Amino acid sequence: MSEGLVQAASIIAALLFIMSLAGLSKHETAKAGCWYGIVGMTIALVATIFGPQSEGTLWIIIAMIIGGVIGVQRALKVEMTEMPELVAILHSFVGLAAVLVGFNSYGLTHETDPVLMNIHNVEVFLGIFIGAVTFTGSIVAFGKLSGKINSKALMLPHRHKLNLAALVVSAFLMVAFLNNPDNIFPVLLMTAIALAFGWHLVASIGGADMPVVVSMLNSYSGWAAAAAGFMLSNDLLIVTGALVGSSGAILSYIMCKAMNRSFISVIAGGFGNDVQVSSDEEQGEHRETTAEEVAELLKNASSVIITPGYGMAVAQAQYPVAEITAKLRERGINVRFGIHPVAGRLPGHMNVLLAEAKVPYDIVLEMDEINDDFADTDVVLVIGANDTVNPAAMEDPNSPIAGMPVLEVWKAQNVIVFKRSMAVGYAGVQNPLFFKENTQMLFGDAKERVDDILTALNK
């Protein structure tokens, strides 16, 4: 394949990637967006493998087949509830790839011009640094999301000074490397520091902020890919990495704004979020209810809002929830969904589940669109949500989630909370909502309880 054809293919692939991002921004065009991305990646792979500068084509194809088989098998087995940790582990692969490309590029450079050599060495150094941070950060995120690592924030003494020291030392190591490129020791030492830095960055971010971490790591992986593109002189990889990096950063900023969190604080590993942890002891008496009583309440309601959370995903309750929604709407009851920006474990988690269950898009509303309507609502069903409906965010300045905008479900006439137990949520704080006079608890598996309500509605 000629150089001109490769450049043309790269432009087409880049346009398809941009169209893919645009398509994924709306429910109606999301499927088309996926196909744009698939076609674009196929074109990019063919152009790269069969380009004029390509070597070892057979080994590349063998590696692609092995990776493809593993990827297809994993994709067929993965549950929707496991998607957040799958995304995190995929980000770690991008980071590791950038590190390996960096060391490989360092060993195979053929530059003779001193200026170009310095530029190349800067690319190598930064590429390895970003990749190493992304790699260990994503591994920690995977561990937290899968429950293998405690979700609480790691609060080391002088943690911000440690982060700053890591950056300063890495900067000095880069200067040392540029002054003596033949000495690889500064690069090896920087790699070790970057691996520890990435681990500490994500470990010091609490469970309540994990959806932001996923989008933040998405951004990091994009910049790691862009750095690899610079090292390989691959324009398409630079463009693609920049698209992923910038879109991930924008998404992180939007989510931080929705949570009243500082973007810099999340990027810096919890900087400036020193709060006193609230007690997780119960704060009063709670009332329990039954599926039959909830069904009767729903029959007599004129307006219902459902606020789903990660518990709905774990129980796979979205399908019976969609059936209840259809039944109530047939009765002329106004049913809508209120989605918190960080409900679940990754951006858009609840939207994906509801779309999977064929819930109409027009009744799925964002927090800002529906918060003012809770006061005029007869019944709110809180299915698997906890921290995102916690009034302590507004009422307790010492709470770890203080200041975070939440769904104000307690303003409704009746609130039904679906929970397995009275345990605290992912942020590790007690929820005063459970003890309010208009709140009733429906204990058990969310899917089983929703099925029981559906059975009672059909009687």
Model-derived segments and spans:
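Transmembrane alpha-helix boundary signature
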Residues: T48-I61, Q73-M83, V99-V115, P181
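Interhelical loops and loop-helix junctions of multi-pass membrane transporters/channels
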Residues: M80-T136, V140-R159, S262-N273
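Structured cytosolic domains appended to multi-pass membrane proteins
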Residues: E282-K459
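C-terminal ends of transmembrane helices
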Residues: L16-K31, G68-V87, S138-A153, F197-M210, ...
